[in-house]
A protein has these predicted regions:
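Asparagine-centered polar/low-complexity signal
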Residues: 22, 159-160, 172
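Short active-site-adjacent structural elements
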Residues: 149-150, 163-165
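Glycine-rich phosphate/pyrophosphate-binding beta-alpha loops
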Residues: 62-66, 158-163
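Short, well-ordered beta-strand elements
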Residues: 152-158
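Short, glycine-/Ser/Thr-/acidic-enriched flexible segments
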Residues: 81, 146, 159-162, 177
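C-terminal substrate-binding/catalytic lobe of Rossmann-fold NAD(P)-dependent oxidoreductases
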Residues: 2-151
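A glycine-rich, Thr/Ser-enriched phosphate-binding loop motif common to dinucleotide/cofactor-binding enzymes
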Residues: 29-32, 164-170
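Amphipathic terminal alpha-helices
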Residues: 167-184
Length: 184
């Protein structure tokens, strides 16, 4: 389930600002798009085409009256039941493919793992990465749990306008330039 800020709706979202403290449990076409895009992102490139990952994604999307940051509740089913320590270690040890590439908009900490309760929160954590001078480029993960039936459950927060849009686009361009996919 995603809880997407009103600014994520562009100009149409501005009308929602007139309905403060509200949650709208439907974003037209967003659930279908999210299900398909997740499988594409997690898929493989084969013969110049993306082959979507072979697993199901079930999404629910709500628009929330928050200034910045999309919050997502994620439940993952895995083949072998992990321990909570293994999941926490995997998140803590995560390193991006762009680590060490000296890209100006790449945060040193692409993912921040919260161990305290009730985090991440858009009001408190939408600008993670501020210490590095890259506010909003770090995603936050928290409330990590392994359920009784072995599923991994957590919340993830990312800044929709900085990491998800403008900053993410600049970072992609920097990477494309570094990889010589595009020229100066």
């Amino acid at each position: 389930s995603t809880y997407q800020v009103v600014t994520g709706a562009g100009n149409a979202g501005l009308a929602l600002l007139e309905q403060p403290f509200n949650v709208i449990p439907h974003i037209p076409e967003e659930e279908t798009k999210m299900e398909a895009e997740t499988r594409k992102i997690m898929g493989r490139l084969s013969r110049g085409k993306v082959r979507p990952a072979d697993f199901s994604v079930v999404a629910s999307c709500a628009r929330v009256w928050v200034r910045d940051g999309h919050l997502e509740s994620v439940v993952v089913t895995v083949d072998e039941e992990p321990t909570l320590d293994e999941v926490v270690e995997a998140f803590s040890a995560f390193r991006s493919e762009i680590d060490g590439r000296d890209l100006h908009t790449a945060p040193k900490e692409p993912v921040h793992l919260f161990t305290e309760d009730a985090r991440p929160q858009p009001a408190l954590d939408a600008y993670l990465g501020e210490a590095e001078g890259l506010p909003g480029m770090t995603a936050g993960i928290g409330q990590v749990k392994v359920t009784e039936d072995g599923r991994i459950r957590f919340f993830v927060l990312s800044n929709n306008t900085i990491r998800g849009s403008a900053g993410g686009s600049v970072l992609n361009a920097e990477l494309a330039l570094a990889e010589r996919v595009i020229g100066p």
